[in-house]
């Protein structure tokens, strides 16, 4: 499935203003509900719902699957997709964060 096909299967995000990624209660990353960010917002919201707000190696791997073809693009062009870069970093460094949807 393509990214757009996958997005259509994920929970809606009309009620959200942003997603915050927290480390020990401190915000380290943010995804606003803004044009160009809504796909990422939807993916991270789906991860938050499925994994009870936990962003770790397992949920990050699922996130990479959801980002579909954009994942390979992010690997080839670091910094082009910061929300995917975060997932890659979580996996590579075995990090654990909290996803908070607002």
Give each language-model segment a name:
Residues 13-15, 41, 46-47, 87:
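Intrinsically disordered, charged low-complexity linkers and terminal tails
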